[in-house]
């Protein structure tokens, strides 16, 4: 029986209603497929990134073998350590004429320093005169030439104006500033106490010139690998004594983490030693009733100390080329208990690359004779005084040495 024409027309021409229920399965299917593709791509990219890191981590040998280190939380940068811009008041001297004038000494108004290319120079007024070279040329201050050219670090004036110099690679020297005559007192590489001198750093001399106290920062690392020494936290730094009469070298203290700057106490019965990696200053007793002992003079400094020098107030100037900002972030503090990250970093990057990430914050503090902080001078971005290694006071001015900057800085203390 045939359907009525009207009913058939309505069925054939009935409008199709498109509902959400009809499209949802198709939409969900597309989403699931896209999600799977995204996860596959993500896993693939992750594998491409992680696989090389795993290869680096397990197959490449790290140049350092870091030790677990425990540092206290850095002190707040407030009070005596309150940030300021006082180091920016300094004047740059002999820009691009002096590279890396690490340490400074004066005899009267004559200023002496050593440079990155192995020279000992005299500064008189506006002139620079080379008085001696400790190593052998060619000397361009490069990493490759440092061991043969020499790298003068600590410098002091002894009796009668004689200069005493600590060279990182070549040892201890006595230099006649008039004739330029050089005398090697202790050779680097010499075996002392069963270990070689590998990184002779700073020194001080008794008033009579009989004893020279000096630091050997490490028997494992050389100066050109100083960041390796800091990051590894190697405890092989030493304090030694050289007797100018008997010519004997004696180990006074060992197991220091980066023994750096050294300064005789006024009574000459003890020396202050910067233990750089630990952000503190130790006091080593070199004579008297406490000879052979050691205690902590200042702990938990706001930066990593380099050279220590007397101030006119009877206290001490301490230079720091890297700080431990609080509030803020200190990479060395963060990594101190993560030796595996240190190993990975040194597998991937060279020291020169890593130094580009070290903030150029320079800090100089003046300590009382008791070790309490008196005042501090800052250059938060190293805009004027960068990589400060020493603060040497003379005639109302503070001369600022640097282990890598191509200039010397001079700060008028009456203006700060």
Swiss-Prot record:
User: Carbohydrate attachment sites?
Assistant: 160
Q: Name one GO molecular function term.
A: arylesterase activity
Cytoplasmic side stretches: 1-39
Keyword annotations for this protein, in alphabetical order, are: Glycoprotein, Membrane, Signal-anchor, Transmembrane, Transmembrane helix
Q: What is its main location?
A: membrane
The residues that cross the membrane are: 40-60
Membrane topology designation? Single-pass type II membrane protein
Any one cellular-component term (Gene Ontology): membrane
The UniProt entry, under SUPFAM superfamilies, shows: Calcium-dependent phosphotriesterase
Q: Which residues lie on this side of the membrane: Extracellular?
A: 61-412
Compartments reported by the entry: Membrane
Q: Give the UniProt family note.
A: Belongs to the strictosidine synthase family.
Instruction: Output the PANTHER family linked to this UniProt entry.
Output: ADIPOCYTE PLASMA MEMBRANE-ASSOCIATED PROTEIN (PTHR10426:SF130), STRICTOSIDINE SYNTHASE-RELATED (PTHR10426)
Tell me the protein's name. Answer: Adipocyte plasma membrane-associated protein
The gene designation is: apmap
């Amino acid at each position: 029986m045939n359907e009525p024409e009207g009913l058939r027309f309505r069925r054939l021409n009935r409008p199709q209603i498109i509902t959400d229920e009809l499209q949802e399965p198709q939409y969900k299917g597309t989403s699931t497929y896209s999600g799977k593709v995204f996860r596959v791509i993500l896993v693939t990219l992750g594998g491409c990134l992680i696989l090389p890191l795993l290869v680096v981590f397990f197959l490449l040998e790290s140049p350092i073998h870091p030790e677990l280190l425990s540092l206290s939380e850095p002190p707040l940068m407030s009070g005596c350590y309150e940030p300021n811009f006082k180091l920016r008041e300094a004047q740059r001297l002999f820009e691009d004429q002096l590279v890396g004038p690490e340490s400074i000494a004066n005899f009267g108004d004559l200023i002496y320093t050593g440079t990155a290319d192995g020279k000992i120079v005299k500064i008189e007024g506006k002139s620079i005169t080379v008085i001696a070279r400790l190593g052998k040329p060619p000397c361009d201050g490069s990493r490759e030439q440092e061991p043969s050219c020499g790298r003068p670090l600590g410098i002091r004036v002894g009796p009668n104006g004689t200069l005493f110099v600590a060279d990182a690679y070549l040892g201890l020297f006595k230099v006649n500033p008039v004739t330029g005559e050089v005398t090697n007192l202790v050779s680097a590489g010499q075996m002392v106490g069963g270990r070689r001198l590998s990184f002779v750093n700073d020194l001080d001399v008794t008033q009579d010139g009989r004893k020279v106290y000096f630091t050997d920062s490490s028997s494992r690392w050389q100066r050109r690998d100083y960041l390796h020494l800091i990051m590894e936290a190697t405890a092989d730094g030493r304090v030694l004594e050289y007797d100018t009469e008997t010519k004997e070298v004696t180990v006074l203290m060992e197991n220091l983490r980066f023994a750096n700057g050294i300064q005789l106490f006024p009574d000459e019965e003890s020396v202050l030693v910067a233990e750089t990696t630990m952000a503190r200053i130790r006091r080593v007793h070199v004579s008297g009733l406490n000879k052979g002992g050691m205690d902590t003079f200042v702990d938990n400094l706001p930066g990593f100390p380099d050279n220590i020098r007397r101030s006119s107030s009877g206290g001490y100037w301490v230079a720091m080329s890297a700080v431990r900002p609080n509030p803020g972030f200190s990479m060395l503090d963060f990594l101190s208990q993560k030796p595996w990250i240190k190993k990975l970093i040194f597998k991937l990057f060279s020291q020169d690359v890593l130094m580009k990430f070290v903030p150029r914050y320079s800090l100089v503090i003046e300590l009382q004779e008791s070790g309490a902080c008196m005042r501090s001078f800052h250059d938060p971005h190293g805009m004027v005084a960068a990589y400060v290694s020493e603060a040497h006071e003379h005639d109302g001015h503070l001369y600022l040495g640097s282990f890598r900057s191509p200039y010397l800085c001079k700060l008028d203390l009456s203006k700060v």
